[in-house]
Amino acid sequence: MDASHAVNVERFIFLGSNCIYPKNCPQPIKEEYILTGVLEPTNSAYAIAKLAGIELIKSYRKEYARKWISVMPINLYGPNDNFDLESSHVFPALIRKFTDAVRNNSKTVTVWGTGKPRREFLHVDDLSKAIILCLDKYDSKEHINIGTGTDLTISELANKIAEISGFNGEIVWDSSQSDGTPRKVLDIQKITNLGWKPTITLEQGIKSTIEWYLENK
C-alpha cells in the first residue's frame, strides 16, 4: 500500500477473505457482522491479517482521501488454483483427489471431516468481473461482500465433483479432521444492487476446472 500511495495509485482494491467473520456468525453474513464474535481458531492469524488490511484501507481513505476499497470474496476456485494436497483449500483438493482416483482406477477417496459444514464457492472469473465493477461503481470505506448467496454441504460438493469427474467408487469421510466453521454464506445484497451477479454455475465451474487440471497437471 505504501508503494501504491507513493506513486499516486488512484484506485486500489484490497482483496480480503470471508475468514474475517466470526466462527458462529448469523447467516447469511452481512458486512456489518465483522468483529462481532470469536474467529475460527484454525485460521485466526490469517483473518487478523485481513482485518488489518481493511483498517489500513480506511486509514488511507481518511488521511489521504484515497478512493481505495476492500472486497471480501467467498471461497474461490478455478484454473491456476493450488492443487497441492498439503496446502490447498477444499475445492481444488477434491478436484485433484477425484480426478487422480479416476486416472489411477482407485476405488476409494478419503475426504477430511464429516462433510456436514456448508460452504459457498465462487468461480475466479466471476470475481474478476465483480472487481472491475467495484472499481467503476463502488467507493466506500466499508468493505463489500462478493459471493453467490447460495451454499451447499461439503458432502454435496464432493458428490458433485465425483460425478462430473467420473468417479464411481466410495467416498470415505475422515471425521478425525476438523470441520472448521459450521456454515459460511455471504449476504451479497450490496454488490447485487450495483448490478453484478455470478454467471458461472457450480456445475459449469467444476467441469471447466477439472478440464484445466487434466490438461495442465
Annotate each predicted stretch with a short phrase.
Residues 51-58, 62, 91-96, 128-129, ...:
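Conserved active-site helix of classical SDR/Rossmann-fold NAD(P)-dependent CH-OH oxidoreductases
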